[in-house]
Amino acid sequence: MKLPNILRHGIILALLALVACTPPQEQAGETPPSTETSTQEEQPASQTVSAQSASCTLVESGSGPQGQVNVRVEEVVTGLDVPWGIAFLPNRDMLVSERAGRVRLVQNNQLRPQVVATINVSDRGEGGLLGIAAHPDFASNRFFYVYFTANANGSPVNRVERWQLSQEGTSATRDRTIVDNIPVAQFHNGGRIRFGPDGMLYIGTGDARNPDLSQDVKSLAGKILRVTPDGQVPADNPFSGSPVYITGIRNTQGFDWVNASTLWVSDHGPSGELGRSGHDKVSVAQAGDNLGWPTTYRCESVQGLVTPAIVWQQALPPGGAAIYTGDAIPEWKGSLIVAALRAEHLQRVVIDPQSGQVQRHEVYLQGQEGRLRDAIMGPDGELYVTTSNCDGRGSCPPEQDKILRITR
């Protein structure tokens, strides 16, 4: 059936009365290496200023105050090549996606030398092998899922496939395509995939440098998609017959569930074009919600669009995000922990689950480990983080990228 376009002309006209210009054409999610500077060098965390509206906290400078909870960083694995995502297996082993197209196995906290799978990817810009997730019933079917930039008859597309790990864990075979023809560009490819508490697969996509696609429910770009483990559209999706679940996204790489029906979603803001920069954000979202891009990107309230919970005026940008559910750091319990790339820290955000308002936000590990890409809770109740220092935008150490455990 023909699906409605949720971008209303009335909303655009109202915004034109509020702002000086309409949103410009998109550029990269992060500044290229040659011109990139550290947000924290410009504004130390201890000197940040925040302003809170009725429903949105604006961090006007810096990233947030320095966190006061003592935490400890443990190196779990080194020698990885841009580890983009982690999928924990029932026995606590990890499958790790390396952006160049390799799936690796970490067994008993040791990186296995054998490559589990090599996927033919296009890793230009922000493409490549991105997210990875294990089937909820992995113990019986050995299925895992990957999001990657594929070459389809000479034209790149973003795709989600299902693979099956061998019993020995030394190899994997492709099973099927789950979602295909997700729009692709050099930048803004999204890429995070996770299974929700309902057993469905959620897929975060970018706007592929075409902001209008984020508001078009007929496009898979700039969305969070929701499909069954076999790639079918669930009957209770908000747009009939469509995998589209949440719209109005620029380039999400992180989301997690506060309850069965509510997600906290991080998103990249504008990249500096025509005077706009930063404005990375976290929003509280449910099925059918519109997070506003490109109609809104600040702490703005517009009818029919979700007002962000928090907006950082200076760029983070956010990578993976996880709600802390462990006991090792009890002060963090229930907080959203966001990995920051350019700003090189972990951001802790405390959001009231009832009102959606930010109660507290603070910075940890500032500059200690460089660029941080993924953040995910492990089955042991600990937080795991991947570094992204060898992605061409950081300083790649001799031991390459790492998986870190954040504990007490």
Predicted regions and their residues:
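C-terminal motif of bacterial Sec signal peptides marking the signal peptidase cleavage site
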Residues: L18-A20
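Beta-propeller domain segments
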Residues: Q47-G62, G127-L129, D137-A139, D207-E362, ...
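Surface loop/turn motifs at the tips and blade-to-blade linkers of beta-strand repeat domains
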Residues: E75-D81, V116-R124, V179-A185, P243-T247, ...
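Asp-box/WD-like beta-propeller blade repeats and closely related beta-sheet repeat scaffolds
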Residues: R159-R194
